[in-house]
Amino acid sequence: MLQMHSNSSFSPKCYYPLQHAGCVKTLQLPLTKVHGGLNRSESKNYAIKCTQSDSFYSTNKIRNNENSSSRNCKPFNKYRVAVTLQQQDCASNNEDDINSTSFRDVLLKKLHALYVFTRPFAMIGTIVGITSIAILPLQSFADLTPKYFMEFLKALLSAVLMNNYVGTVNQVADVEIDKVNKPGLPLASGDLSVGTGLAITLILSLTSLAIALSLQSPPLIFGLIVWFLLGTAYSVDLPFLRWKTNPFLAGMCMVIVFGLVYQFSFFIHFQKYVLGRPVVITRPLIFAAAIISTISAVMSLLKDIPDEDGDKQFGYQSISSKLGKENVLRLCVYALFFAYGVAVIVGASSSFQLGKLVSIIGHSTLAFLLWLRAQTVDLSNNASTYSFYMFIWKLFYAEYLLIHFLR
């Protein structure tokens, strides 16, 4: 007798020739996959019971069915192997893509952190300022020789590196304060480690001084050494240093660097050691030193307004916390109005008609824009006060363009 019962899985039971009649043997056959799915048509249990006389016949029949099933499944097994290999290749490719994307993202993040670490707005100010001062000693297009351009690039590079040193050493010294005032900066946010920042700072300063020494220009070497010392004294927290906590000393540092070092050290370098002419202090140079010094003093006062919260938390008494934000803002705006008024008078006294016109209109326009911008400042909003501070940097850039029309 042959008895079959349908169940949820395939489990044939049969008597083998060497078994006694009436015993049961369970045979579990593997389920096959058809294009990634189970062959549901074979997913049944078969209970096979054989007598002694027909056990051999039943066993052979089951084996024949197994062989037939195996033959029928060969094409599907072949497809299954192909699909498996294809899946492995896809997984490998996906992993490579993920690793490539991850490396690219990390690299771009580090490069952006380095860019922010250099304080690009100050670097742009250095490029504009040094370029403008380098043009002042020129008397004709014949002065624009290949040697002049090479010496200009070397001097500009030394200035940019020193400017970056001053900005980065300030961030290294202010990591904890910047976590409150400027959490987006690389060291404060953790995008760069303090060790990495310190290493970059040292490389910048040493490279800048090395370039200056290679140029063998005493005014340039002197100017960069003064710049280095003042930048260090401004930020480093050592006895008798960290001058940024003192409003007078902080303002003095910025006035000396931007108002004097920029103008006189680099002007004399280009005039005497690049062009080979005797030193002659010109009217535009004196005017540039005066008005840039005023703008620098204003920037030293305004930069503390958005940082007042962090300064108070760490016990620093900035001028805005002593006098009040509104009074400091008013003082800075009035100082710039006075400077632009003087600039208009000086421009009006010029014998160069085009220069007179440009100087009067240009400085009047800057004063008007300053007045409009000052009306929109929200002293209770740090983002607003910082935006106004950045606007003063734009006035700084513009002044280096206008000084060339004062003859």
From Swiss-Prot:
EC number: 2.5.1.138
One MF annotation (Gene Ontology) recorded for this entry: prenyltransferase activity
Transmembrane segments: 121-141, 184-204, 209-229, 279-299, 328-348, 352-372
Enzyme type, top EC level: transferase
Cofactor(s), names only, from the UniProt record: Mg(2+)
GO cellular component, one term: chloroplast
Keywords, alphabetical: Chloroplast, Membrane, Plastid, Transferase, Transit peptide, Transmembrane, Transmembrane helix
Main location as per UniProt: plastid
Compartments where located: Plastid, Chloroplast membrane
Superkingdom of source: Eukaryota
Gene3D superfamilies documented for this protein: UbiA prenyltransferase
Transit peptide: first to last position: 1-81
Similarity field: Belongs to the UbiA prenyltransferase family.
Record's function text: Prenyltransferase specific for geranyl diphosphate as prenyl donor and coumarin as prenyl acceptor. Can use umbelliferone and esculetin as substrates, and with a lower activity, 5,7-dihydroxy-coumarin and 5-methoxy-7-hydroxycoumarin. No activity with 5-hydroxy-7-methoxycoumarin, bergaptol, xanthotoxol, p-coumaric acid, caffeic acid, 2,4-dihydroxycinnamic acid, kaempferol, genistein or homogentisate. No activity with dimethylallyl diphosphate, farnesyl diphosphate or geranylgeranyl diphosphate as prenyl donors.
Protein name in the entry: Coumarin 8-geranyltransferase 1b, chloroplastic
Organism: Citrus limon (Lemon)
Species classification: Eukaryota, Viridiplantae, Streptophyta, Embryophyta, Tracheophyta
